[in-house]
């Protein structure tokens, strides 16, 4: 009912807002919509932010959509906001340790680690890899 009344940009804003819902299923649905919509740069922080949360299915969805894609814009975003990005990485590890450590005993096999490393450019030392 609403898409007829909203512009393409308004629909993307709608998906960004609902990607922060209290309900994980709603967050996942709207993140999928953002990823399917050829995400504009201004919406990328919503995708990066949701990847530091505890819902494994969302991490899996984002990784599946971004894996094999050109993620240079995501990597640049993360490097330009490195302190915030590093905090999100630490939060993701904390959730792995609390909720998923027994299912994914080896951290390097956990999808969050793969997502942060392959798609967002987090390197082993946690240092900025882009020189300005």
PLM features: residue spans?
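Long, helix-rich interaction regions
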Residues: 70-132
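Structural detector for internal amphipathic alpha-helices that build alpha-solenoid repeat scaffolds
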Residues: 1-5, 17, 28-38, 61-72, ...
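Amphipathic alpha-helical scaffolding segments comprising HEAT/armadillo-like alpha-solenoid repeats
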Residues: 8-16, 40-49, 75-79
């Amino acid at each position: 009912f609403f898409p007829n009344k909203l512009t393409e940009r308004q629909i993307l804003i709608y998906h960004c807002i609902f990607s922060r819902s209290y309900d994980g299923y709603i967050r996942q649905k709207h993140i999928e919509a953002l990823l399917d919509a050829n995400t504009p740069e201004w919406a990328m922080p919503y995708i990066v932010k949701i990847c530091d949360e505890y819902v494994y299915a969302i991490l899996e969805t984002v990784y599946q959509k971004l894996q094999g894609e050109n993620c240079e814009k995501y990597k640049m975003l993360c490097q330009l906001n490195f302190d915030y990005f590093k905090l999100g990485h630490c939060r993701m590890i904390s959730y792995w340790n609390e909720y998923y450590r027994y299912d994914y005993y080896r951290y390097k096999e956990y999808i969050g680690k793969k997502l942060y490393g392959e798609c967002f450019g987090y390197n082993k030392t946690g240092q900025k890899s882009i020189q300005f």
